[in-house]
UniProtKB/Swiss-Prot annotation:
Its EC number is 1.14.11.-. Keywords: Dioxygenase, Iron, Metal-binding, Oxidoreductase, Vitamin C. It is an enzyme of class 1 (oxidoreductase). 2-oxoglutarate binds at R165. This is PKHD-type hydroxylase PMT9312_1262. Residues 80-174 form the Fe2OG dioxygenase domain. Fe cation binds at H98, D100, H155. It comes from Prochlorococcus marinus (strain MIT 9312). It comes from the Bacteria. Transmembrane segments: none annotated.
Amino acid sequence: MNFLTNQLLIQEEIEALIKNLNKENTLWEDGKKTAGSHASMVKNNLQLNRESEISKKLSHLIKKKILSSPLIKSFALPKIIHGIMFTKSLKDMQYGRHIDNPFMSSGRADLSFTISLTDKNTYDGGELIIEEMNSEKEFKLNAGEIIIYPSTYLHSVKEIKNGERLVCVGWIESYVKSIEQREYLFDLDAGAKGLLAKNGRSDELDLIFKSYSNLLRLLGN
C-alpha cells in the first residue's frame, strides 16, 4: 500500500488551528520562496512564514499528532518529520506538476504528507493529483484528514475554482527508504497485531514479532 489516508485531527483541533492561522494575515507570503528551482515555476499559492513563532508552535503540534498515531507510525516508520508548513490556495491558484526535493536542510524526503484544514465541500477544484507509473490518483480530503504518499511521485494541485484550500504539508524521513520494504513491514505488523487482538498472545506470534523487529533492524538506517 503506497498511500495512507486517515482522520488525524478532531473538529476542536481543526477550529483551533484555523483560528490561530486567521490571526496571522501579515505572515502569509509567496509560496515560491520554499520551492526548488523547477517547482517554483509552477507554484502559485501562499504559505505562512516558517520562521514565525506561530508557524513553529503549530508545526510542533502537528508533529505530535502524527507521532501519536500508531497507524501512521507503522506505515511510515518516521525517523524525522520535517519541513512542516501551512499553505493557502485562493481562487485561480494552483500548484503544477512537480517532484519534491529529495533532500532538505531538515532531512531526506521519503514520504510527503498533506493535512486538510478545510473540508472538501467548501471549495471547488484543488484536487491533489498523484501520478503512479501507469495511472493518476485524485484526492480531495475531509477537514482533519491526512494523506501520506511517496515523495518520489510526480504530483500537482488543481486550480481553485471557488473558495479557499487551507492545508498543512510536510515530509517524513523514514527509517526504511524503500517503498516496497515499508509495505512488507506494514503488512507484517498489521497482520501480527490483528492476530494478537483476535487470538491473544502465542509462541508463534512471538516469532512473528521477533522477525518483524529483526527485519526492521536489518532494513532500517
